[in-house]
Amino acid sequence: MIIERLTGNLRDLNPLDFKVDYVDLEWFETRKKIARFKTRQGKDIAIRLKDAPKLGLSQGDILFKEEKEIIAINILDSEVIHIQAKSVAEVAKICYEIGNRHATLYYGESQFEFKTPFEKPTLALLEKLGVQNRVLSSKLDSKERLTVSMPHNEPNFKVSLASDFKVVMK
């Protein structure tokens, strides 16, 4: 089965009205536009998203819906550093340092709380900066992601040289 478009999200439906099968993804797999997966019930799924969400796939995104059957995304829990800032200045420092490492940053559950995937060097940096943090297991859902840039995107247009193209060296 090839999926080219998302058809909604489970949060907009009553999941009890449907037979729901899930595709379990790690947080870093949610930004894939082309991939193959197996559902929990063993169905082969291929995605080739034409209009992929800028932030990536989110918890509960519906890949397939037909009558009473749904195949949806489940983002697996992973080891995460929960960061609690004490001030706006500390928020700026956290965002700068995490961004400088090109690490992913997510909003947390409360104001001034952030999450980032666990990496020992990041944890050591936060300790060195004196930023309050703890390592927990939780979901990193794309809808809570602070950054939206997608590295190495392919252009959706064709480039060709004009017939009168010339290179002039001076």
From Swiss-Prot:
Involved in urease metallocenter assembly. Binds nickel. Probably functions as a nickel donor during metallocenter assembly. This is Urease accessory protein UreE. It is found in: Cytoplasm. InterPro entries: UreE, UreE_C_dom, UreE_N, UreE_N_sf. Gene3D superfamilies: Urease metallochaperone UreE, N-terminal domain, UreE, C-terminal domain. Its main location: cytoplasm. SMART domains: UreE_N (SM00988). The gene is ureE. Keywords: Chaperone, Cytoplasm, Nickel, Nickel insertion. It comes from the Bacteria. GO terms for cellular component: cytoplasm. Pfam families: UreE_C, UreE_N. One of its GO terms (biological process) is protein folding.
